[in-house]
Regions:
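Cytochrome P450
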Residues: 1-247
Length: 247
C-alpha cells in the first residue's frame, strides 16, 4: 500500500466497524462511499500485482499463491476488511488500553519502571485485559450439548471473548491488571484452534517494541482526561485517550 496514503488504512478501519452519527461518519451513505473507495483502491492494487512480478508484500503473496489467487470478489473484500481491521485496529486499541491500564494501576507501572523486562509478560496481559474484539460469531457444523444447552447444526453462536477473559474459574483475580502473571498468555483474545488469529505473534511483537521504546524514552505516559470509547458492541476500543508525556 502506498506509504503516502497509509492514514487511509486507519480511516477505513475505523469506518468499517463504526455506526454513522457518532463521530466517524455522518450517514450510512457517506460510510458506503468511503468503503467503496477502499474497495476500488485495493481492486486496482490487486490488478497491479497480478500483472507484475511476485513481490514480498502481502497483497502480492495473495495474488500469486495457489490458495488465494482465484478469490471471488466477495472473498477478496472479506479478507481485505479482515486484514485492515485486524491488522491495525486491534493493535492500536491494545496500545491505548495498556496506557490506561497502567494509569489505573500505578503499582503495576512502578513494577514496570523498576524492571522493564516485565514487558514480555505484560503484553499478553494487556491483550487479555483490553480484549480489543469483544466477540466473534461462528456457525455450528454439528449438533452439540454445551452447558446444558443444545446447539443445533447451522445455529449462529456468538463467543464473548471479553467474558472468557474475565472468567474467574480459569484466571485468578481476573478483573485485576497484573503484569507479572505466571501464565499471561492464557486468554481468548486471539481466538482458538483453526480460527486463531493468524497475526497473533505479530501483534505481540508490535506491542513489545512499542513498550520497549516508550520505557526507553519517557518516565511516564499520563492519562489526563476521560477516554472516549468507540460506540460498538464488537470493537472494544477508544476514539480518544488524552495523555501527557513526562520525560
Amino acid at each position: 500500500f502506498p506509504q503516502a496514503k497509509r492514514r487511509l488504512l486507519t480511516r477505513w478501519s475505523d469506518i468499517a466497524v463504526s455506526e454513522p452519527g457518532f463521530g466517524i461518519v455522518d450517514s450510512w451513505e457517506s460510510r458506503r462511499l468511503e468503503l467503496e473507495d477502499c474497495f476500488t483502491t485495493f481492486a486496482a492494487l490487486w490488478q497491479e500485482r497480478l500483472q507484475g512480478e511476485p513481490r514480498s508484500d502481502l497483497l502480492s503473496l495473495m495474488v500469486h499463491a495457489e490458495g488465494t489467487k482465484n478469490l471471488s470478489p466477495g472473498e477478496f473484500l472479506g479478507n481485505l476488511i479482515n486484514l485492515i481491521v485486524g491488522g491495525n485496529d486491534t493493535t492500536r486499541n491494545s496500545i491505548s488500553g495498556g496506557v490506561l491500564a497502567l494509569n489505573q494501576n500505578p503499582g503495576e507501572y512502578d513494577k514496570l519502571r523498576a524492571n522493564p523486562d516485565l514487558i514480555t509478560g505484560m503484553v499478553p496481559e494487556i491483550i487479555r485485559w483490553q480484549t480489543p474484539l469483544a466477540h466473534m460469531r461462528r456457525t455450528a457444523t454439528s449438533d452439540i450439548e454445551l452447558g446444558a444447552k443444545t446447539i443445533k447444526k447451522g445455529d449462529k453462536v456468538v463467543m464473548w471473548y471479553v467474558s472468557g477473559n474475565r472468567d474467574g474459574e480459569v484466571i485468578e483475580n481476573p478483573n485485576a491488571f497484573i503484569i507479572d502473571r505466571e501464565r499471561p498468555r492464557q486468554h481468548l483474545s486471539f481466538g482458538f484452534g483453526i480460527h486463531r488469529c493468524v497475526g497473533n505473534r505479530l501483534a505481540e511483537l508490535q506491542l513489545k517494541i512499542v513498550w520497549e521504546e516508550v520505557m526507553k524514552r519517557w518516565r511516564f505516559v499520563e492519562v489526563v482526561g476521560e477516554p472516549k470509547r468507540v460506540r460498538s458492541s464488537f470493537v472494544k476500543g477508544y476514539e480518544t485517550l488524552p495523555v501527557r508525556i513526562q520525560a
